Amino acid sequence: VGSEMCIRDSQFLYSILAEEKCQEAGVEIAYYEFPTALTQTENGWQVDCMGFGTKRRVICKQIVDCTGGAEVVGLLGLERLRGEERQPGSYLFKIGDPHNPASSQLRRLYVHGADSTNSRTVTLANLTGRKTILSRVRNSKERLMHLQPETGFRESFRIIGDTVITVQDYTSGRHFEDAVSYAFYPVDLHTRTGVKPKPLKRGIVPTVPLSSLIPKGSKNIIVAGRCISSDRLANSALRVQAACMGMGQAAGATAALAAQNKTTPSSVPLDKIHGLLREHNAIVPEKS
């Protein structure tokens, strides 16, 4: 209590361990496939997906959209929100001495105007970032030691849910009646001149309500991650990994319960969601 701790992990090892857990649970992983059309059925959804050399039709009861920009929500024609101005993306890389790898520090390059709307805008952001990094490598005469595969995007489309989390909700640590997970990060809006995080006051722990994860007017779909229903400043804090993990676990539990009980995510009793989350060792919001 009263101290801060940063836990660093290996993104590469984490991804392999996550794959292992999914496969142990019977999940069929389908990399490189994307939904192209969705049809609502009497019992849920028909989802047509396509990848290179593959086509697949998935019949399911519930959808969890974790695409970052609410791409599935957009395919359904449900309302999404995005401002004209976007935070810069970041491209992570290392340049240094290959004979002294400890001397090379991870660097972050701002990619201004980075837009994750579609494949063409993502391609443009990646080309822009890599061009600048190549220029730095040439000028420094150092070795490029590491390069992330693509630009990291901070901001994209957000859904509009029955609850829109405001920055006041976030910074005051409002406990929503339908809270399903926690967040913790400072308000962290990046601009062309940099970023000045606004830390939360000691003891303030924001919550994420279920109603901010369900698109308004929808049925049998829930989201998790950066596309949560929130204003821009609140979203700048909610978009980070730990908060997204909590949302994902809550959304998955809600979707599973909805499928098992032949109901919709918004109709699942909150105590059932909390109970299932606790079974899987999630940290469940409680009123102080």
Regions found by a protein language model. Name each.
Residues 1-7:
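Short, small-residue-biased leader/transition segments that mark boundaries at the very start
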Residues 3, 15, 32, 50-62, ...:
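Flavin (FAD/FMN)-binding glycine-rich loop and adjacent Rossmann-like elements that form
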Residues 8-17:
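Short beta-strand to alpha-helix junction loop
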Residues 12, 22-23, 35:
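N-terminal cofactor/phosphate-binding cores enriched in small/glycine residues
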Residues 21-28, 217-218:
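A structural motif corresponding to the C-terminal end of an alpha-helix
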Residues 31-45:
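A conserved short coil-to-beta-strand element within the FAD-binding core of flavoproteins
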